[in-house]
A protein has these predicted regions:
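C-terminal alpha-helical "lid" subdomain
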Residues: 1-2, 139, 151-223
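Walker A/P-loop NTP-binding motif of AAA+ ATPase domains
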Residues: 2-169
Length: 223
């Protein structure tokens, strides 16, 4: 159900055959498309423990604190021989040319230094690929883009998540901005509602999630 520019199953199989597990991935694109889930799946394929860090785990109010936390994260993963995952890593790898404070530069420098020397695999996920420092891109073995699900994937997901066929009155154009995360959310809503939910009601909830992603319509005329 993942729409990516790389065959993720084949990628995992090829990585399993590597004599040395020193590689890095940047998984980027639409929110809710399964980037973090794939990173954890990859760890299971490699039979490796996971060390997962969010920016909130690492950012510090003290001078030099964030840099120390970044170094500690890599050290922890190294000690455990774990797959290190940075979730929403854009805050740690933001383009230094846009920095306005010195610590915004030093924390990126620390990330780049650690990425260069780390002997074990690591994965960064981001919804904001364009904001990453260009030097960071050279440190990723693979950069994998995640997009909205294809129409065929949406139809399969409806059957998989809800054990029902999708309503026949839905056109392909109606299904252009859905992700696995949307299906998970609607599945949770349906479970909370308790009573059996019809395909039409489920589809209505999915389309509402899709609508929430669209930018607000711009008004035309004079104020």
């Amino acid at each position: 159900l993942l729409n990516t520019d790389v065959d993720l199953h084949q990628l995992a199989e090829n990585i399993k055959k590597l004599p040395e597990r020193r590689f890095s991935l940047c998984l980027y694109g639409i929110s809710g498309t399964g980037k973090s889930a794939y990173a954890e799946y990859l760890a299971r394929c490699l039979n490796m423990p996971v060390v997962k860090k969010r920016c909130s785990d690492l950012l510090s109010m003290w001078v030099g604190g964030t840099e120390k936390n970044i170094a500690a994260a890599f050290s922890e993963a190294g000690d455990k021989k774990a797959l290190l995952i940075f979730d929403e890593a854009d805050s740690l790898l933001q383009d230094r040319s846009r920095a306005v404070r010195s610590w915004e530069v030093t924390q990126v420098n620390e990330m780049l230094t650690q990425m260069e020397s780390h002997p074990y695999p690591f994965v960064c996920t981001t919804n904001l690929m364009d904001s990453l420092d260009k030097a960071s891109l050279r440190r990723f073995t693979f950069k994998v883009e995640y997009d909205y699900m294809t129409v065929a994937q949406v139809r399969r997901a409806f059957k998989l998540f809800f054990a029902q066929d999708m309503p026949k009155n839905i056109t392909d154009e109606d299904l252009s901005r859905l992700t696995p995360g949307d299906f998970t959310l609607v599945q949770q809503k349906a479970a909370i509602l308790g009573a059996a939910t019809s395909p039409d009601e489920l589809m209505k909830m999915l389309l509402l999630e899709q609508k929430n992603k669209l930018p607000p319509a711009r008004s035309i005329g004079f104020i």
